[in-house]
Amino acid sequence: RYLESHGFEDIREAIPMDYCSIGLLPTNKMGQYIHQTIRTFNPNVVLIDGEPLLTHSLRISHPNIKIAVLLNPADVRNDENDKESMDYFNTLYACADLAIVHGLRKITDNGTYRDFVSTNTILRPEIMSVYHKTSKNIYCVLGGGTVNVGHQFAASTMALAELCQQAAVLMSDYTMHIICSSSNIYDAINENYTPNNVVLHSHVLNASDYYNDACLIITRSGRNTLSELAFLGIPAISVITGDDYRRKEQTQNLKAINSDNIKAIPTNIDLVEFVALCKKLVDTSCVQRTFIPGNDTAIRKILSM
């Protein structure tokens, strides 16, 4: 909206040729578009969400523009990745004037950054206005990682969806909503037997559509969703899924959050045990909000540039 107010209405979306396994390519059409937009707009600050290659390219081509980069703690410090890879990523991210690392765990500067702050996760504005009320709705949020991922991660996503479908049969008093973020996952789930109390959503819903009336959220252990649940205090089951890299990061997230209303399970949990845990959690109340988002800290740092 800010760009549109200044005459930039042609906001483009990246296509597969614009990115690789470590982010946007500054040398393809989207990269060219970003560089051209910056030259035309001439901003005081450029804010980048990750994107190591693009951060490096912008520093080379626009040396006088202030750059702030938003990072996950695992982008800066990750023992599961080899040292050479982390050295490379950190060197590219350190081209920015400011690094804002936001997540569920705090880390310290490794000495390569110009200006560095580690804070709690930055939450979406709509999360702040969620008004939660009691209901009989359980939401399984399959969420991120369902597009352009490996077979192992997609398989674990399907396993979680099937587990919730089976659980719904034993929880007839509740409505089980399964939220898919890609058509391939939705189509695969839709081929299974679907009980009457299961609702399949083919696309991502607005946060208020499920947080407002969920008695329980079932999701994988990603940084953003766990942070939102910690802030809202909604009972949740967090599933550790995916490849070794993602499982390690998710385990770190759960350890850092240490919340009584969020319980972790493996994808191979017994159905009866899973249903028992669901019933136990839906009978609990939302806990008091103790998680303070990192939004204000991030804004203050950017304004001080």
Tell what function each PLM region has.
Residues R1-Y174, N184-M305:
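Nucleotide-activated sugar donor-binding and catalytic core shared by glycosyltransferases
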